[in-house]
Curated annotation (Swiss-Prot):
Identification of the protein by name: N-acetyl-gamma-glutamyl-phosphate reductase
Entry keyword annotation includes Hydrolase: no
Protein encoded by which gene: argC
Organism of derivation: Brucella anthropi (strain ATCC 49188 / DSM 6882 / CCUG 24695 / JCM 21032 / LMG 3331 / NBRC 15819 / NCTC 12168 / Alc 37) (Ochrobactrum anthropi)
Keyword set, alphabetical order: Amino-acid biosynthesis, Arginine biosynthesis, Cytoplasm, NADP, Oxidoreductase
Function per UniProt: Catalyzes the NADPH-dependent reduction of N-acetyl-5-glutamyl phosphate to yield N-acetyl-L-glutamate 5-semialdehyde.
Single Gene Ontology BP annotation: L-arginine biosynthetic process
UniProt GO cellular component terms: cytoplasm
Family statement: Belongs to the NAGSA dehydrogenase family. Type 2 subfamily.
Gene3D superfamilies per record: Dihydrodipicolinate Reductase, domain 2, NAD(P)-binding Rossmann-like Domain
Active site: C117
Length: 311
């Protein structure tokens, strides 16, 4: 029998992306609740319990409710794309390239928390340096990022695209999370293996999909004051053999005059760069990805495939 997949929240931005990605899969059976019945709690529970894997594309509270509906029904495995369970010890963190053995943890888990889009980029840059002993746990990490506006869901899409919207956003680029209390910070700190809370400054640009995440570092603050080449080698070694995360060669990065946030829009990959001038003592680590690809729906499908033993 084909595995049954239920997307709880398939009419939202991430849910629609996942549904589209699974539409041509003949190895799966996607079961869908009628849109008019999506708030019917009892019917949702039936669909959740009928699924082999339920992918939750819901706000945090609704995701917690969905999980509660599955209490006592351990045959259904869950991928949660919300923030609700990303730092919960009982949930596997769904970043397959995080560390050695992470793919296996996801493959064997019943509960998988899909990473956030910004943390995916930031952790991809920070975690290898922590694991290699280059980045001290108490280093004052700063993360600066810009995302396509689809990351804000249907509400922000309407605000950016509909000029008649009562809360229309006319800005081409804006900062938010100004009190430095963004909900992604605990996730960044835990899975980045940081003792100190990172400063996270997110922004949104007037483009639908794409993302740039930057982590600038002073090399003098790292163990042994490593060279750019050493930092680059740590990243390349960490992601060697991976087919989704790519590290740009130093020679390629040195020739670039700019990085386009939309370069990987519509794709599931992530590309990492090491920028700087050898000997200057500074490095800017950059992750390029699609906020709805590796940053959301692409990662969810990757995790689903791992859980089904298909990759």
């Amino acid at each position: 029998m084909k595995p049954k997949i239920f997307i709880d929240g398939e009419h939202g931005t991430t849910g629609l992306q996942i549904r589209t990605r699974l539409a041509e899969r003949d190895d799966l059976e996607v079961i869908s609740i009628p849109e008019a019945e999506r708030r019917n709690k009892d019917l949702r529970a039936d669909y959740l319990r009928a699924a082999d894997i339920a992918i939750l594309c819901l706000p945090d509270d609704a995701s917690k409710e969905a999980v509660s509906l599955l209490e006592g029904h351990n045959s259904t495995r869950i991928i949660d794309t919300s923030t609700a369970h990303r730092v919960h010890p009982d949930w596997a963190y769904g970043f397959a390239e995080l560390a050695k053995g992470q793919r296996e943890r996801i493959a064997e888990a019943r509960l998988v928390a899909n990473p956030g889009c910004y943390p995916t980029g930031a952790i991809a840059l920070v975690r290898p340096l922590r694991d290699a002993g280059l980045l001290p746990a108490d280093y004052p990490v700063s993360v600066n990022a810009v995302s396509g506006y689809t990351g804000g869901g249907k509400q922000m899409i309407a605000q950016m695209e509909d000029k008649s919207h009562p809360e229309h956003l006319a800005a081409n680029n804006f900062l938010y999370g100004l009190p430095l209390k963004h909900k992604h910070v605990p996730e960044l700190q835990l899975h980045g293996r940081l003792d100190r809370r990172p400063i996270f400054s997110p922004s949104v640009g007037r483009f639908p999909q794409g993302m740039i995440v930057q982590v600038p570092l002073f090399l003098t603050g790292l163990e042994g004051t490593p060279s750019l080449a050493k930092v680059h080698s740590v990243l390349t070694d960490h992601y060697a053999g991976q087919d989704i995360v790519e590290v740009a060669p130093l020679e390629e990065s040195a020739k670039l005059a700019r990085v386009d946030a939309e370069e990987l829009a519509g794709k599931d990959g992530m590309k990492l760069f090491v920028f700087g001038t050898e000997g200057d003592g500074e490095v800017n680590l950059v992750a390029l990805l699609d906020n709805l690809g590796k940053g959301a729906s692409g990662a969810a499908v990757q995790n689903m495939n791992l859980m089904l033993g298909k990759v």
